[in-house]
Amino acid sequence: MSDITANVVVSMPSQLFTMARSFKAVANGKIYIGKIDTDPVNPENQIQVYVENEDGSHVPVSQPIIINAAGYPVYNGQIAKFVTVQGHSMAVYDAYGVQQFYFPNVLKYDPDQFEHRMSQPSGADLVGITPKGSVSDNLHVITPEMFGALGDGESDDFQAIQDAIDYAALHRMRVQGTGKIYAVSSTIKLKVGIKSLSHMNIIAMTERMTVLSNNDNNSDLQCDVHDNEINLNGVGLIGMLFYGIVNSGIYNNKITGLTLQDCYGIRIGILSNDFISKNNSIYNNICILGPDPDNGTGTRTMVGIALIGRYHGTHGGIEENGNLIWDQPLTVINTDVYGNYVYGGTHNIFCPGCIYTRIHDNHFEAGSHRNINTSIQSQRLLISNNKLINAGSSAIVTGNTRWVEITGNYIQSSQSSAVSSDDSAIQFGGDIDGLIIDGNTIIGDWKYGVHGAYAKRVTIQNNRIESSKANIAIESSWLSSPPSGAIYSSSRNEPYPPSTATFQINISGNLHMGTGCAIYMSQLENKELMQISVSNELINNAYSRSHCVYVFESDSKASGLSLSNINASGASYDKYFSTRGNAPFLSINNVTSLTTDIVPITSATPILFGSDMYSISSTTPITDFHYGMPGEEINVKGFVGGTIIHNAGVIRLKGGVNYVGGASAGNDIIRFKRIGNTWFEICRNF
């Protein structure tokens, strides 16, 4: 009876026929087999039972089945294997006809139902494969070897891999490597329909090639690319280049061998079409780039990760008349970049023309020019909690951008002082709007901690900053040849500067370390510097700094400045400077030494800055107090032989008579108030 498929063994679930209440054989007992949930003793309920021979043949037997003295079921006195073709009930009786067991459905106890389990939808889960996983994990997986790939690291496997991808795209399957090394001579193109590409170990063979990209005619590619290793081998140009990719993850990849000019590890977006890349995540990748042969001068481009959206290309988005133009379609949208490690090259990450980009929790190191470059025309960016190490020129640069947040980053360098360009941990310029710099730690040999120009609506707060030139420097312009008085400015070439003024800058709650000037403000090139508030700053090492606050104006166009609650223990009055004294300020309050020291007057036209207490210290006649604030009141202490000249339009003294210090002039105090452009005497103590 070879046509029978009998795989259900007639047996106790414990595989031994024993008594119910003692571990003894059911000697000379009987077994009855019937339909599920019926009494098998009743002949109407019984089903056919077979003896399975050693050759796999089956012989039908009658019931009941006899149990021998040892507890084994026998046929014609011989121990045999009894089977059925279906699930069944089973009753076991002893030699005295007493029921010992009854099982309404033996299959519930899994005596032998592998074929049944294999026939279920989850059956593929039961079959394992090498090196790991099961058949069900790989039902929709294609390998390059299925299409002829050799994977020896020398033969060209491009066509086999491309054929595998084409097939997978057509059938909505995945392509997965087998652990071998695939050498390729041409760009592998992903196509719409492929679900993922993973575990490929690829080496580039052709000069300046792109290893992995997508079909030029496809947009809305949705494909996860993960756990791949790409070696550009010193000849390849780009590891991965995707555009028009959506809702995809690029993760756990490793890209090495990047040494050429204009090379990229992972790049999303190109400038030559309007394909939209959106809702993508780039995470937990490793990109190792070779050293920049030009040592961070910015003349080369070697990028680990790039997000390149469309932007107005003329002069970095600036027209020749200085206006910033936002006229390009948004092509790189909502990208999450996190957990990546990028080492070397010129820019660890570069992302112009992007919107809704989050760059967080990455480790970027040894970018010879910048760790993070968000210029040009990116908007709504978050740069947070990154570790930025040893950028040669600047750790973070953002230019011609709006609504960028730079928060909680650790920024350290021990090599930026050797580079002549930028030299700023965080640098911004080129018509910036809505920038927040908050809670960053900046240490090392930076010349500037935070350095910006051409900006509006900027907040710089709660940062810890260490630098050698200026911790926070805000300028209205950058010049290739700054005026001599702009002592903390650096030479910068800006061939097409924005026309915007620099205004609405809030600086608050920062901790100043290092030896550089803590706060530097510079108005240059006839551009206005306005509405800058500095408050609640803590300046360490104030006594050893060249300046705590330095304000320079080349065109008297700084206005609306304010200083308040500046704690600079150990500072002296000469640690503060303003070209026009109080003139550009709305208010100065509670600034260590600046608002508390008695300031000596030795010239005919002393510049008033900060303090309200001045002491005549020479016999030079005083003809004006320069640069007072409207409504400001000052006290002037006399000096033997010292003189204040009455001039009704400049200094108006009591009775229209000059003040001349007599023998007790050291005790004289005259109080003045500025109304309009005239100082009025309001009282004296003598």
Where are each of the predicted segments found?
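N-terminal extracellular ligand-recognition/capping segment immediately after the signal peptide
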Residues: 158, 162, 166-209, 581, ...
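Exposed extracellular interaction/assembly regions and N-terminal maturation sites
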Residues: 126, 131-146, 589-652, 674-686
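Consensus "Asn ladder" position of solenoid repeat domains
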Residues: 228, 253, 280, 285, ...
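Beta-solenoid repeat scaffold
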Residues: 174, 185-205, 214-227, 247, ...
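N-terminal assembly/attachment segments of tailed bacteriophage virion structural proteins
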Residues: 1-113, 147-148, 155-173, 177-182
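Short glycine/acidic-rich loop motifs that flank beta-strands on beta-rich extracellular proteins
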Residues: 173, 184-187, 204-210, 230-241, ...
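Extracellular disulfide-bonded cysteine-rich modules/repeats
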Residues: 87-90, 666-675
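Fibrous stalk/shaft segments of extracellular and virion attachment machinery
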Residues: 107-159
